[in-house]
Amino acid sequence: MSDAQQITLIVDGEETKVTEGTTGAELFFERRDVVVARVNGVLKDLDQVLTEGADVEGVTIDSPDGLNVLRHSTAHVMAQAVQQLRPEAKLGIGPYITDGFYFDFDVADPFTPEDLRTLEKMMQKIINQNQKFVRRVVTEEEAREAMANEPYKLELLGKKNDASDAAEGVNVEVGAGDITIYDNVDRKSGESIWCDLCRGPHLQNTKIISNAFALTRSSAAYWLGNQNNQQLQRIYGTAWPTKEALKAYQERIAEAERRDHRKLGVELDLFSFPDELGSGLPVFHPKGGIIRKAMEDYSRQRHVDAGYEFVYTPHITKGHLYEVSGHLDWYKDGMFPAMQVDAEFNEDGSVRKPAQDYYLKPMNCPMHNLIFRSRGRSYRELPLRLFEFGSVYRYEKSGVVHGLTRVRGMTQDDAHIYCTREQMKDELTTTLNFVLGLLKDYGLDDFYLELSTKNEEKFVGDDAAWEEATRTLSEVAEASGLHLVPDPGGAAFYGPKISVQAKDALGRTWQMSTIQLDFNLPERFELEYQAADGTRQRPVMIHRALFGSVERFMGVLTEHYAGAFPAWLAPVQVVGIPVAETFNDYMFDVVGQLKAAGIRAEVDISSDRFPKKIRTASKDKIPFVLIAGGEDAEAGAVSFRFRDGSQDNGVPVAEAVRRIVDAVKNRES
């Protein structure tokens, strides 16, 4: 073979010569786990021809990108099956998502669980046919002809140049560059059986999907996520490289369902969501109130120890405040509509004094700025750390409201720190360490950081200030030693932020604390302090929410602990169960000693039999159960029964009280 017929590639970091016209499939022929190629940083189908000098990397099916391709291809197979089952179905979008995929359809009737099982069988037949995924580049006219019976696809073609801004999932269909259609091609006849407008890439064939997939649920969804659009039916599914991986995922999902805080909230009588109040507005029951108070009390004391000062602000304010802050320009869609009040009328009904717009506050920062500005400030007062458990209200769309983790009325553990530029870096470091330490005290200890930077379409202030703020946050994050992940364009309009991402007991990631650096609001509110040289200077402002919101944090902890809260948070820390009614007085005396020591303890004197009382305590996830019978009463002792079913008999009452008090004091899990 002459050199003229060969080209040079960089394959997985090494220079390699191959025959001109070689495809990714040929290059990685011996690596059966490679499903697509990353060519010069862009994912490509394996059947695309490689060119001189290309930097090529094989992407395996079990890698994050490989899993996304697997799931996107499975979504195509599902859509093909749906249009076989319901030929009248019109296609929406069908992207991959975390751990799975979905596809939207315009159909007359919602899909039933029986439909999903039928579709799974039809999908398996398609997979077994080993259909090929074939990419073809088309003109817009050709695309419109191919999609003539798909009105939603035709609409997407009209959004080609701004697909990234249209809605989640749209850019898997159209975007910058070529318009492409993927055909599912019959291997024997070579004919296209089904096609979809799609940017790809895809697997080479359906058989790679194997049988490690499942359709999980269906729901209603508005076209492009806009509630003013047509309501479609969405089918969710998942796909994995092996049946074992699918089973492991399904087991994780089953465990997550058992831990669902909405379910546990009912079972443990912690909180509820009355329809009479409206979507996203929870109420806490007495037991939930105990947990919440314990969370807040501990946080409050830690803030006092760290030099924070407590403030309180109202729930509503004049709209002008949010004009100054910029929220009405940049965040109005997330706010509840204005209330018009204080209008005055003449006797003839004409307006003597027009009404003013008042808003439920979506954030506490503007009000904290007014506190800072209420009098002259000196550099000697800085850093000034203001803290509030502040109630805020945000108009979340009904479709995204979810239990306690996405609500419309919430309480933020909100701090705003005002400091000099010289203090800025040290204060950020101190704040991050404080945040991480406090989260660990609540039982979360697996973290990484995310750095959200400027959204070029949505920001206030000058580029230099943003660059300085971003650089400083990045240095502080890197110095923490935690893994740092970029979040380009994810910042709020007034400044970049670090967010602490925490993993729970199931390995799921939750965004917890946020630390945001802001040079802009001090400018907009004309905040000043007198510097050591007598000049007036602008402070730097740090926004910090540790829990995110109290409601959300409680939802996360409920699932993290599966409702079995550590003793210091548990609403009932001890239940005393006498073996027989004869020992009720003895157990009341023991529980009285515990209550005197500050322990939340009860005696179960219900008419239930002893075994039922034990089961009830277990179901209620009580940390400590104390049992007393004849031998215990004679010896001045009790028997400990723990959550795991183990038991420690004959423990002297004084020692039992000490053990429990120590466990609560030390916040043992």
Swiss-Prot record:
- Tell me the cofactor note: Binds 1 zinc ion per subunit.
Name the keywords, alphabetized. Answer: Aminoacyl-tRNA synthetase, ATP-binding, Cytoplasm, Ligase, Metal-binding, Nucleotide-binding, Protein biosynthesis, RNA-binding, tRNA-binding, Zinc
GO BP of this protein:
threonyl-tRNA aminoacylation
Q: Where in the cell is it found?
A: Cytoplasm
- Enumerate the residues binding Zn(2+): 365, 416, 543
PROSITE patterns in alphabetical order = AA_TRNA_LIGASE_II (PS50862), TGS (PS51880)
**Cofactors, names only:** Zn(2+)
Q: Which GO terms describe its cellular component?
A: cytoplasm
Domain of life where this protein originates: Bacteria
Describe the protein's quaternary organization and the partners it interacts with: Homodimer.
Descriptive protein name? Threonine--tRNA ligase
In its UniProt entry, the species of origin is given as Paenarthrobacter aurescens (strain TC1)
Name the gene behind this protein. thrS
